[in-house]
Design a protein with these regions (language model features):
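A gly/proline- and charged-residue-enriched helix-loop-helix capping module
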Residues: 125-129
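N-terminal beta1-alpha1-beta2 submodule of the flavodoxin-like/Rossmannoid cofactor-binding fold
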Residues: 1-99, 104-122
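Conserved catalytic-site loops of classical short-chain dehydrogenases/reductases
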Residues: 94, 139-140
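Short, conserved loop/helix-junction motifs that constitute active-site signature segments
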Residues: 132-138
């Protein structure tokens, strides 16, 4: 099995860090392939914005994230950090999100990963069929 672990904690020696390390050790011990994205270590940009989209915009007068994500996925003009994470996700058969609960939810850096990487046109499409998205053939 190919696993992607997205880890979101600023302290590697934390309980969350230990849980991530144990997951890596356990999965590799069974012969699984494991890839880890450490959002804090890579200083992942957590804010969606116009700089996520290169090339001609769908609407240069108004920033619609959904429209720009769709266009950028169709034209291959997403920011390189997003594309790199999408490639990791496309290779994975299982996704593990390792994070602490802060203020009743995930850390902002992980929410930013979800917002930017699970882009419209990549992880889902606007119609109900879900037949066009890369991840349409498997549940997320």
């Amino acid at each position: 099995m190919k696993a992607l672990i997205v880890y979101a904690h600023p302290e590697p020696k934390s309980f969350n860090g230990a849980m991530k390390d144990l997951a890596v050790e356990t999965l590799r011990g069974r012969g699984d392939e494991v890839e880890v994205t450490d959002l804090y270590a890579m200083r992942f940009k957590a804010v969606v914005g116009a700089d996520d989209f290169h090339g001609e915009r769908a609407n240069p007068e108004f920033l619609s994230i959904a429209a720009e994500q769709t266009r950028a996925c169709e034209t291959g003009t997403l920011a390189s950090d997003i594309v790199a994470e999408q490639k990791k996700l496309a290779r994975a058969e299982i996704l593990i999100l390792q994070f602490p609960i802060w203020w009743f939810g995930m850390p902002a850096i992980l929410k930013g990963w979800v917002d930017r990487v699970l882009a419209r046109g990549f992880a889902y499409v606007a119609d109900a069929s879900m037949t066009q998205a890369c991840c349409a053939e498997r549940p997320l």
